[in-house]
Amino acid sequence: MKILLYGDYYRWKSGYAREIRDILPFLRKNNDVRQVALGYNGYPIDKDMVVYHTKTPEVKDHYAQEVLHYALDDFNPDIVLTVQDFWMLPKISFTLAHPGKFKWVHWGTLDSEPLDFYSRESLKWMHYCFWQSHFAAIECKQILPDLLGEVIYPSVDPKMFKKLNKDELKTQFNLNEINILICNARGQQRKNVPVLLDALKEVLKEESNTVLILPSGIQRTKTDSGDFDGYDLERFVGELKLTDNVLLPRNPDRGPIDDKTLNIQYNLADINILPSWGEGFGLPFIEAGISGVPSIGVDCSAVREIVRNRGLLIKPRAYTYNLDGSKYQLCHPDDLKDAILKLLRDKGKRIKYGKEAEKFAKKLTPESRAKLMLDRFKQLIKEDAQPASRR
């Protein structure tokens, strides 16, 4: 079977790159797999597989529709698996709507509701959808009931993220008397980290021996066009006078730390927190969860089903609309503070939620995700499945 992957270059550190990287070895067994690699300029040269690079002066848009078009002609795949959000689909769906032998399957995330105005037409042209949450499945089916698909959660690699001895780690780093919170989120506005910093200020008034680790680096995030889109977290930490209580580990390029170090920091943590306005899945929930760490998240989007009985959900107090018609949910720092204090002061609850999180995360192996996909690919080809627009 010839499979063309489309998404962030699998060697990068983004969430989508990780999702592709985890399942790639299993997809490649007895199959010919290539990738249209977003953000990759061709260097260093990838010697392990054929990769179509997209970052060139001639390609003006990050999503590189013309490179995808070339790859389709050059490779003639049986399956095209796109791994991205839903909102960007209009940038590539015209190319994928052209009649061909391939079956287009989208493994997609949705972080807000309803499905935005502009990506709805694209649903009609995909042969099948792998939703990364039941939330996404419901929102898409409300727009296009005839869309075929199933929910396949992303994986967490047990070789990289695994449970260590928390007591020994805390002793090793002289942190036995310290409450440790972790938030593996970039400065992207949607991640809402400054509100967590506001909540931390209030937590410190009652639990002064508390620190927050922000391991995603301090690089300003950028839009696909290269403009800055995100908070200068280091400046926020200084402005809020939290320098002594917020740790900002980063690599030499000011970006995210390596996975081995990240796993240690998850294991040091007592609570994992994502205060986002919305999440398409939330990989940190399972990366921390596989180490038995409970989570706190906002009761909306995919977060509701991923956290469930594996932590605490905060009810949003307000929402705001995006320009594309979808809306994000906003939590209040006081509610975030209350949830943090509640879990910090109840070790029994932390253990209970942590066990449920670990049990859930351990089921999401890369091999199991890849098997579900490969089985479906074979069926789509055998049955010559068609998109909703051609049925």
Describe the function of each predicted region:
Residues 135, 155:
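Carbohydrate-associated surface elements
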